[in-house]
Amino acid sequence: MDQNNSLPPYAQGLASPQGAMTPGIPIFSPMMPYGTGLTPQPVQSTNSLSILEEQQRQQQQQQAAQSSTSQQATQGTSGQTPQLFHSQTLTTAPLPGTTPLYPSPMTPMTPITPATPASESSGIVPQLQNIVSTVNLGCKLDLKTIALRARNAEYNPKRFAAVIMRIREPRTTALIFSSGKMVCTGAKSEEQSRLAARKYARVVQKLGFPAKFLDFKIQNMVGSCDVKFPIRLEGLVLTHQQFSSYEPELFPGLIYRMIKPRIVLLIFVSGKVVLTGAKVRAEIYEAFENIYPILKGFRKTT
Protein backbone atom coordinates (compact mmCIF):
# COMPACT_ATOMS: atom_id res chain seq x y z
CA MET A 1 0.00 0.00 0.00
CA ASP A 2 1.25 3.49 -0.89
CA GLN A 3 2.27 5.60 2.10
CA ASN A 4 0.84 8.81 0.62
CA ASN A 5 -2.51 7.19 0.11
CA SER A 6 -2.59 5.97 3.71
CA LEU A 7 -2.56 9.56 5.06
CA PRO A 8 -5.99 11.07 5.67
CA PRO A 9 -6.91 14.15 3.60
CA TYR A 10 -6.69 16.58 6.54
CA ALA A 11 -3.15 15.41 7.36
CA GLN A 12 -1.78 16.05 3.90
CA GLY A 13 -2.54 19.78 4.25
CA LEU A 14 -1.58 20.55 0.66
CA ALA A 15 -4.79 20.85 -1.27
CA SER A 16 -8.40 19.84 -1.10
CA PRO A 17 -9.73 17.15 -3.36
CA GLN A 18 -10.86 18.32 -6.74
CA GLY A 19 -14.38 19.70 -6.72
CA ALA A 20 -14.25 20.78 -3.05
CA MET A 21 -15.99 24.11 -2.20
CA THR A 22 -13.27 25.46 0.13
CA PRO A 23 -9.51 25.64 -0.32
CA GLY A 24 -7.34 23.38 1.77
CA ILE A 25 -6.09 24.57 5.15
CA PRO A 26 -2.47 23.63 5.87
CA ILE A 27 -1.89 21.83 9.13
CA PHE A 28 -0.01 23.76 11.83
CA SER A 29 3.68 22.93 12.09
CA PRO A 30 6.19 24.21 14.68
CA MET A 31 8.47 25.25 11.83
CA MET A 32 5.84 27.48 10.27
CA PRO A 33 5.49 31.09 11.39
CA TYR A 34 2.50 31.72 13.60
CA GLY A 35 -0.58 32.63 11.56
CA THR A 36 0.82 31.42 8.25
CA GLY A 37 -1.91 30.13 6.03
CA LEU A 38 -4.65 31.09 8.49
CA THR A 39 -5.57 34.43 6.88
CA PRO A 40 -8.75 33.97 4.85
CA GLN A 41 -8.48 35.20 1.30
CA PRO A 42 -11.14 37.68 0.20
CA VAL A 43 -13.48 36.32 -2.36
CA GLN A 44 -14.54 38.95 -4.87
CA SER A 45 -17.63 38.55 -6.90
CA THR A 46 -19.14 40.69 -9.58
CA ASN A 47 -22.35 41.06 -7.56
CA SER A 48 -20.62 42.62 -4.52
CA LEU A 49 -18.61 44.98 -6.73
CA SER A 50 -21.73 46.19 -8.49
CA ILE A 51 -23.48 46.82 -5.14
CA LEU A 52 -20.50 48.87 -3.87
CA GLU A 53 -20.40 50.91 -7.06
CA GLU A 54 -24.13 51.58 -6.80
CA GLN A 55 -23.80 52.76 -3.18
CA GLN A 56 -20.88 55.05 -4.05
CA ARG A 57 -22.84 56.54 -6.95
CA GLN A 58 -25.86 57.22 -4.67
CA GLN A 59 -23.62 58.91 -2.06
CA GLN A 60 -22.08 61.14 -4.74
CA GLN A 61 -25.55 62.15 -5.95
CA GLN A 62 -26.68 63.02 -2.40
CA GLN A 63 -23.53 65.11 -1.78
CA ALA A 64 -24.07 66.97 -5.06
CA ALA A 65 -27.71 67.70 -4.14
CA GLN A 66 -26.73 68.99 -0.67
CA SER A 67 -23.98 71.23 -2.07
CA SER A 68 -26.37 72.75 -4.61
CA THR A 69 -28.95 73.42 -1.87
CA SER A 70 -26.36 75.15 0.35
CA GLN A 71 -25.20 77.32 -2.57
CA GLN A 72 -28.76 78.45 -3.24
CA ALA A 73 -29.24 79.26 0.46
CA THR A 74 -26.07 81.39 0.61
CA GLN A 75 -27.10 83.33 -2.52
CA GLY A 76 -30.40 84.44 -0.91
CA THR A 77 -31.18 88.09 -0.22
CA SER A 78 -29.95 89.68 3.00
CA GLY A 79 -32.46 89.73 5.85
CA GLN A 80 -33.94 86.35 4.91
CA THR A 81 -32.92 83.33 6.93
CA PRO A 82 -32.33 80.23 4.77
CA GLN A 83 -34.40 77.30 5.97
CA LEU A 84 -33.50 73.63 5.57
CA PHE A 85 -35.98 71.04 4.49
CA HIS A 86 -37.21 68.66 7.16
CA SER A 87 -35.27 65.80 5.59
CA GLN A 88 -32.06 67.85 5.73
CA THR A 89 -32.30 69.13 9.31
CA LEU A 90 -29.30 68.24 11.40
CA THR A 91 -29.82 66.27 14.58
CA THR A 92 -26.85 65.54 16.76
CA ALA A 93 -26.93 63.05 19.61
CA PRO A 94 -24.60 63.75 22.56
CA LEU A 95 -21.97 61.20 23.50
CA PRO A 96 -22.75 59.07 26.56
CA GLY A 97 -21.65 60.75 29.76
CA THR A 98 -21.56 64.24 28.24
CA THR A 99 -24.04 67.11 28.09
CA PRO A 100 -24.66 68.89 24.80
CA LEU A 101 -23.34 72.46 24.61
CA TYR A 102 -26.07 73.66 22.23
CA PRO A 103 -29.75 72.68 22.04
CA SER A 104 -30.98 70.52 19.20
CA PRO A 105 -32.39 72.48 16.24
CA MET A 106 -35.63 70.52 16.58
CA THR A 107 -36.11 71.73 20.19
CA PRO A 108 -38.80 74.44 20.39
CA MET A 109 -37.48 77.77 21.64
CA THR A 110 -39.19 79.44 24.59
CA PRO A 111 -39.89 83.15 24.02
CA ILE A 112 -38.60 85.50 26.68
CA THR A 113 -40.47 88.72 25.97
CA PRO A 114 -43.34 89.40 23.60
CA ALA A 115 -42.35 90.93 20.30
CA THR A 116 -43.26 94.57 19.88
CA PRO A 117 -43.69 96.22 16.48
CA ALA A 118 -41.38 99.23 16.45
CA SER A 119 -43.66 101.20 14.12
CA GLU A 120 -46.80 100.92 16.28
CA SER A 121 -47.28 103.36 19.15
CA SER A 122 -50.17 103.33 21.59
CA GLY A 123 -50.38 107.09 22.10
CA ILE A 124 -51.38 106.41 25.73
CA VAL A 125 -49.20 107.58 28.62
CA PRO A 126 -49.65 105.74 31.95
CA GLN A 127 -50.16 108.02 34.94
CA LEU A 128 -48.14 107.48 38.13
CA GLN A 129 -50.40 106.72 41.09
CA ASN A 130 -48.00 105.85 43.90
CA ILE A 131 -44.27 105.96 44.64
CA VAL A 132 -42.62 104.11 47.52
CA SER A 133 -39.25 105.39 48.71
CA THR A 134 -36.92 104.68 51.61
CA VAL A 135 -34.46 106.82 53.55
CA ASN A 136 -32.11 106.33 56.48
CA LEU A 137 -32.23 108.92 59.27
CA GLY A 138 -28.92 107.67 60.67
CA CYS A 139 -29.86 107.47 64.37
CA LYS A 140 -31.88 105.43 66.84
CA LEU A 141 -35.36 106.73 67.56
CA ASP A 142 -37.71 106.59 70.56
CA LEU A 143 -41.02 105.85 68.90
CA LYS A 144 -43.10 106.60 72.01
CA THR A 145 -41.68 110.11 72.23
CA ILE A 146 -42.37 110.72 68.54
CA ALA A 147 -45.95 109.45 68.82
CA LEU A 148 -46.68 111.62 71.89
CA ARG A 149 -45.12 114.87 70.68
CA ALA A 150 -45.69 114.83 66.91
CA ARG A 151 -48.89 115.73 65.10
CA ASN A 152 -50.79 113.25 62.94
CA ALA A 153 -48.78 110.33 64.33
CA GLU A 154 -50.02 107.02 65.70
CA TYR A 155 -48.14 104.16 67.32
CA ASN A 156 -49.51 100.76 68.33
CA PRO A 157 -46.58 98.39 68.98
CA LYS A 158 -48.87 95.39 69.41
CA ARG A 159 -50.22 95.92 65.92
CA PHE A 160 -47.23 97.31 63.99
CA ALA A 161 -43.72 98.17 65.23
CA ALA A 162 -43.49 101.60 63.59
CA VAL A 163 -44.88 105.10 63.94
CA ILE A 164 -47.39 105.99 61.21
CA MET A 165 -47.13 109.69 60.37
CA ARG A 166 -49.04 111.69 57.74
CA ILE A 167 -48.69 115.13 56.17
CA ARG A 168 -51.06 117.00 53.86
CA GLU A 169 -48.62 118.50 51.35
CA PRO A 170 -47.56 116.42 49.57
CA ARG A 171 -50.29 114.04 50.68
CA THR A 172 -48.19 111.10 51.87
CA THR A 173 -47.74 108.60 54.70
CA ALA A 174 -44.49 107.64 56.44
CA LEU A 175 -43.57 104.55 58.43
CA ILE A 176 -40.83 105.43 60.94
CA PHE A 177 -38.94 102.58 62.64
CA SER A 178 -36.85 102.66 65.81
CA SER A 179 -33.71 101.75 63.82
CA GLY A 180 -33.89 105.07 61.98
CA LYS A 181 -35.22 103.65 58.71
CA MET A 182 -38.23 105.34 57.15
CA VAL A 183 -40.59 104.38 54.31
CA CYS A 184 -42.53 107.08 52.47
CA THR A 185 -45.60 106.18 50.36
CA GLY A 186 -48.35 107.97 48.47
CA ALA A 187 -46.41 110.48 46.37
CA LYS A 188 -47.39 111.02 42.72
CA SER A 189 -43.92 111.89 41.42
CA GLU A 190 -40.26 111.42 42.28
CA GLU A 191 -39.88 115.04 43.38
CA GLN A 192 -42.90 114.84 45.69
CA SER A 193 -41.56 111.65 47.27
CA ARG A 194 -38.18 113.24 48.03
CA LEU A 195 -39.81 116.43 49.36
CA ALA A 196 -42.13 114.47 51.65
CA ALA A 197 -39.25 112.38 53.01
CA ARG A 198 -37.31 115.55 53.84
CA LYS A 199 -40.33 116.99 55.67
CA TYR A 200 -40.65 113.86 57.82
CA ALA A 201 -36.93 113.98 58.61
CA ARG A 202 -37.31 117.65 59.64
CA VAL A 203 -40.17 116.75 62.01
CA VAL A 204 -37.98 114.12 63.69
CA GLN A 205 -35.14 116.66 64.00
CA LYS A 206 -37.42 119.17 65.72
CA LEU A 207 -38.26 116.50 68.32
CA GLY A 208 -34.60 116.46 69.40
CA PHE A 209 -33.16 113.53 67.44
CA PRO A 210 -29.96 113.97 65.38
CA ALA A 211 -31.67 112.82 62.19
CA LYS A 212 -29.91 112.99 58.83
CA PHE A 213 -31.09 112.36 55.28
CA LEU A 214 -29.12 109.37 53.94
CA ASP A 215 -29.54 106.83 51.16
CA PHE A 216 -32.77 108.09 49.64
CA LYS A 217 -33.97 105.56 47.07
CA ILE A 218 -37.17 104.90 45.14
CA GLN A 219 -38.17 101.26 45.62
CA ASN A 220 -41.41 100.96 43.64
CA MET A 221 -43.53 102.93 41.20
CA VAL A 222 -47.16 102.22 40.33
CA GLY A 223 -48.86 103.49 37.18
CA SER A 224 -52.24 102.98 35.55
CA CYS A 225 -53.98 103.67 32.25
CA ASP A 226 -57.01 102.71 30.16
CA VAL A 227 -56.82 101.23 26.63
CA LYS A 228 -60.49 102.17 25.97
CA PHE A 229 -61.62 98.74 24.75
CA PRO A 230 -62.63 95.45 26.44
CA ILE A 231 -60.13 92.57 26.47
CA ARG A 232 -60.61 88.80 26.14
CA LEU A 233 -58.66 87.68 29.19
CA GLU A 234 -59.37 83.96 28.58
CA GLY A 235 -57.66 84.03 25.20
CA LEU A 236 -54.77 86.09 26.54
CA VAL A 237 -53.99 83.66 29.36
CA LEU A 238 -54.09 80.68 26.98
CA THR A 239 -51.70 82.27 24.50
CA HIS A 240 -49.30 83.75 27.08
CA GLN A 241 -49.67 81.19 29.86
CA GLN A 242 -45.94 81.23 30.66
CA PHE A 243 -46.20 84.92 31.60
CA SER A 244 -49.72 85.25 32.97
CA SER A 245 -52.16 83.79 35.48
CA TYR A 246 -55.92 84.36 35.61
CA GLU A 247 -58.18 83.13 38.41
CA PRO A 248 -61.47 85.06 38.13
CA GLU A 249 -62.86 83.35 41.24
CA LEU A 250 -60.01 84.79 43.34
CA PHE A 251 -59.18 88.06 41.57
CA PRO A 252 -60.95 89.70 38.61
CA GLY A 253 -57.75 90.79 36.85
CA LEU A 254 -55.17 88.91 34.82
CA ILE A 255 -51.67 89.03 36.34
CA TYR A 256 -49.04 89.39 33.59
CA ARG A 257 -45.38 89.12 34.68
CA MET A 258 -43.16 90.72 32.06
CA ILE A 259 -39.50 89.69 31.95
CA LYS A 260 -37.94 92.77 30.38
CA PRO A 261 -38.54 95.23 31.86
CA ARG A 262 -39.33 93.36 35.07
CA ILE A 263 -42.83 94.71 35.55
CA VAL A 264 -46.04 93.13 36.84
CA LEU A 265 -49.23 94.18 35.05
CA LEU A 266 -52.81 93.79 36.26
CA ILE A 267 -55.08 93.64 33.20
CA PHE A 268 -58.85 93.89 33.62
CA VAL A 269 -61.58 92.96 31.16
CA SER A 270 -62.75 96.59 31.05
CA GLY A 271 -59.43 97.69 29.51
CA LYS A 272 -57.91 99.14 32.67
CA VAL A 273 -54.22 98.29 33.20
CA VAL A 274 -52.15 98.71 36.38
CA LEU A 275 -48.34 98.52 36.18
CA THR A 276 -46.16 98.02 39.25
CA GLY A 277 -42.62 97.03 40.18
CA ALA A 278 -40.71 99.76 38.34
CA LYS A 279 -37.69 101.57 39.74
CA VAL A 280 -37.75 104.40 37.18
CA ARG A 281 -40.53 106.03 35.20
CA ALA A 282 -39.20 104.80 31.83
CA GLU A 283 -39.82 101.17 32.79
CA ILE A 284 -43.54 101.90 33.20
CA TYR A 285 -43.74 103.42 29.73
CA GLU A 286 -41.70 100.65 28.10
CA ALA A 287 -43.79 97.89 29.66
CA PHE A 288 -47.04 99.44 28.44
CA GLU A 289 -45.72 99.89 24.91
CA ASN A 290 -44.78 96.19 24.96
CA ILE A 291 -48.19 95.00 26.14
CA TYR A 292 -50.38 97.31 24.03
CA PRO A 293 -50.05 95.41 20.69
CA ILE A 294 -50.84 92.17 22.52
CA LEU A 295 -53.96 93.68 24.08
CA LYS A 296 -55.11 94.89 20.67
CA GLY A 297 -54.83 91.32 19.41
CA PHE A 298 -57.29 90.20 22.11
CA ARG A 299 -59.76 93.05 21.73
CA LYS A 300 -63.29 91.90 22.48
CA THR A 301 -65.73 92.55 19.64
CA THR A 302 -69.34 92.99 20.77
Curated annotation (Swiss-Prot):
<dbReference type="GO" id="GO:0005634">
    <property type="term" value="C:nucleus"/>
</dbReference>
<dbReference type="InterPro" id="IPR012295">
    <property type="entry name" value="TBP_dom_sf"/>
</dbReference>
<keyword id="KW-0677">Repeat</keyword>
<dbReference type="InterPro" id="IPR000814">
    <property type="entry name" value="TBP"/>
</dbReference>
<feature type="compositionally biased region" description="Low complexity">
    <location>
        <begin position="109"/>
        <end position="119"/>
    </location>
</feature>
<comment type="subunit">
    <text>Belongs to the TFIID complex together with the TBP-associated factors (TAFs). Binds DNA as monomer.</text>
</comment>
<feature type="repeat" description="1">
    <location>
        <begin position="128"/>
        <end position="204"/>
    </location>
</feature>
<feature type="repeat" description="2">
    <location>
        <begin position="218"/>
        <end position="295"/>
    </location>
</feature>
<dbReference type="Pfam" id="PF00352">
    <property type="entry name" value="TBP"/>
</dbReference>
<comment type="similarity">
    <text>Belongs to the TBP family.</text>
</comment>
<dbReference type="InterPro" id="IPR033710">
    <property type="entry name" value="TBP_eukaryotic"/>
</dbReference>
<comment type="function">
    <text>General transcription factor that functions at the core of the DNA-binding multiprotein factor TFIID. Binding of TFIID to the TATA box is the initial transcriptional step of the pre-initiation complex (PIC), playing a role in the activation of eukaryotic genes transcribed by RNA polymerase II.</text>
</comment>
<dbReference type="GO" id="GO:0016251">
    <property type="term" value="F:RNA polymerase II general transcription initiation factor activity"/>
</dbReference>
<feature type="compositionally biased region" description="Low complexity">
    <location>
        <begin position="89"/>
        <end position="101"/>
    </location>
</feature>
<keyword id="KW-0539">Nucleus</keyword>
<feature type="region of interest" description="Disordered">
    <location>
        <begin position="53"/>
        <end position="121"/>
    </location>
</feature>
<dbReference type="GO" id="GO:0006366">
    <property type="term" value="P:transcription by RNA polymerase II"/>
</dbReference>
<dbReference type="InterPro" id="IPR030491">
    <property type="entry name" value="TBP_CS"/>
</dbReference>
<protein>
    <recommendedName>
        <fullName>TATA-box-binding protein</fullName>
    </recommendedName>
</protein>
<dbReference type="GO" id="GO:0000995">
    <property type="term" value="F:RNA polymerase III general transcription initiation factor activity"/>
</dbReference>
<keyword id="KW-0238">DNA-binding</keyword>
<dbReference type="GO" id="GO:0005669">
    <property type="term" value="C:transcription factor TFIID complex"/>
</dbReference>
<feature type="compositionally biased region" description="Low complexity">
    <location>
        <begin position="57"/>
        <end position="81"/>
    </location>
</feature>
<keyword id="KW-0804">Transcription</keyword>
<feature type="region of interest" description="Disordered">
    <location>
        <begin position="1"/>
        <end position="20"/>
    </location>
</feature>
<dbReference type="GO" id="GO:0006383">
    <property type="term" value="P:transcription by RNA polymerase III"/>
</dbReference>
<dbReference type="GO" id="GO:0006352">
    <property type="term" value="P:DNA-templated transcription initiation"/>
</dbReference>
<dbReference type="GO" id="GO:0003677">
    <property type="term" value="F:DNA binding"/>
</dbReference>
